[in-house]
């Protein structure tokens, strides 16, 4: 450096190193992915990280409400909201695209919009229906997979009622609805159908005794994991709405005319049906199977901090993550409650890694589980107490509203929430 009486001249200027912002790439805007993004944007400044969210739709849908949209008791528009409503666009770049491939070794994701590199990856791609290789199910059964599928089921059922009312030679099998699966989704869908069928009968002048709704379940029980007393209540309530059950009866084939059931060791029965809805199993997204990460039915048994085994820069949340409840040595169920909590912890652990701090183990805070049986009935356990009827239904709607509030605040809750509480 040379000093003069008028100037200070710096002969050589060393460049100031610029710290590169880490890129956090989040795949999927379901409960887990969106909770991760919302919590990241709350905690990080614009210059702290580049956050990219990729989702095939520009909206998020409440997957725990899809059974209502499928039955026709809730409009599909009520189930979804724009992603732009809940992300800060100066902090989060949203890419509407279909994820096509994930290369965790090259740290590269390929989508319909191009290629995306990352420093940290969060996989929250949600679930797919599992048909267990049963012939015909993929082709002839409907599945409550997303908003579009729910709309399809609603319109299909309405079409069957409308066609029956117009045709000269009545095909009563049009009015038979078979629901495969007596788990959470199947039972909640049956509850909504029990409310919706009388409305359809009145709208299309269909005698109620012409309609048949049958739930078939391969397992020997309804709602596995629920208290037997609550299960008994649920079955009784659904039967009072005209729902029939065939438990311990697996579906072995689906055709355009209906389903074939195994009713004994060498005994089978074919039931004609105008509508078959499959709600008997889910799996993680198939892209998981192509990553090279060890998985079971596209679900990864994640480390305690939600990272994929062997990949310190990859987190997995929601339906694609498998965690074992060590108290009962069984996986935690893939619920919205757990997915949102995983999103919170995932965001916290990402920030910890960026700061060079240790990550934390994820421990689910299970507040309970409630299954609806229609608009004003439900069963469940909340805060250690069993409940049924309108009280349980009230709690169910409060849980649904809370999920909206945690992501989008009071504004989103008032716009999309459920307030028909009594």
Where are these regions (language model features)?
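Beta1-alpha1 glycine-rich phosphate/pyrophosphate-binding loop at the start
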Residues: 2-93, 177, 187-225, 277
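FAD-binding core/adjacent interface of flavoenzyme oxidoreductases
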Residues: 2-21, 92-176, 180, 266, ...
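C-terminal auxiliary extensions adjacent to catalytic cores
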Residues: 12, 375-422
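Short hydrophobic core segments
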Residues: 27, 117-127, 251, 271-281, ...
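A Rossmann-like FAD-binding core segment of flavoenzymes
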Residues: 90, 94-101, 195-304, 310
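FAD-site-proximal beta/loop scaffold in flavoenzymes
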Residues: 139-168, 271-341, 348
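Internal hydrophobic alpha-helix adjacent to the cofactor/substrate pocket in enzyme cavities
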Residues: 195-198, 337-364
């Amino acid at each position: 450096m040379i000093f003069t009486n008028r100037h200070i001249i710096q002969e050589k200027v060393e460049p100031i190193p610029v710290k590169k912002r880490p890129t956090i790439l989040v795949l999927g805007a379901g409960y887990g992915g969106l909770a991760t993004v919302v919590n990241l944007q709350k905690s990080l400044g614009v210059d702290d990280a580049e956050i990219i969210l990729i989702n095939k739709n520009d909206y998020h849908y409440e997957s725990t409400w899809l059974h209502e949209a499928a039955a026709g008791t809730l409009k599909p528009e009520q189930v979804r909201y724009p992603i732009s409503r809940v992300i800060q666009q100066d902090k989060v770049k949203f890419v509407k695209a279909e994820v096509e491939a994930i290369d965790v070794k090259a740290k590269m994701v390929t989508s319909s919009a191009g290629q995306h590199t990352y420093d940290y990856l969060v996989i929250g791609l949600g679930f797919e229906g599992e048909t267990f290789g049963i012939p015909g199910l993929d082709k002839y059964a409907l599945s409550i997979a997303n908003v579009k599928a729910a709309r399809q089921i609603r319109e299909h059922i309405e079409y069957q009622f409308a066609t029956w009312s117009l045709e000269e030679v009545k095909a009563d099998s049009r009015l038979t609805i078979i629901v495969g699966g007596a788990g959470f989704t199947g039972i909640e869908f049956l509850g909504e159908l029990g409310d919706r069928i009388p409305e359809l009968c009145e709208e299309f002048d269909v005698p109620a005794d012409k309609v048949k709704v049958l739930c078939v379940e391969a397992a020997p029980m309804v709602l596995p994991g629920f208290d037997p007393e609550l299960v008994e209540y649920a079955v009784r309530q659904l039967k009072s709405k005209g729902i029939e059950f065939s438990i311990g009866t697996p579906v072995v084939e689906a055709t355009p005319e209906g389903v074939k059931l195994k009713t004994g060791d060498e005994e089978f029965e074919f039931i004609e049906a105008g509508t078959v809805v499959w709600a008997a199993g889910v799996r993680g997204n198939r892209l998981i199977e192509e990553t090279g990460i060890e998985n079971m039915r596209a679900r990864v048994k994640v480390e305690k901090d939600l990272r994929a085994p062997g990949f310190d820069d990859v987190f997995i949340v929601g339906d694609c993550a498998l965690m074992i409840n060590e108290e009962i040595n069984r996986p935690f169920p893939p619920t919205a409650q757990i997915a949102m909590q995983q999103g919170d912890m995932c965001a916290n652990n990402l920030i910890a890694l960026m700061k060079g701090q240790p990550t934390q183990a994820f421990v689910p805070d299970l507040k309970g589980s409630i299954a609806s049986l229609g608009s004003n009935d439900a069963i469940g356990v909340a805060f250690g107490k069993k409940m049924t009827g309108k009280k349980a239904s009230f709690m169910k709607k409060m849980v649904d509203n809370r999920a909206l509030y945690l992501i989008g605040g009071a504004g989103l809750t008032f716009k999309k929430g459920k307030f028909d509480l009594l």
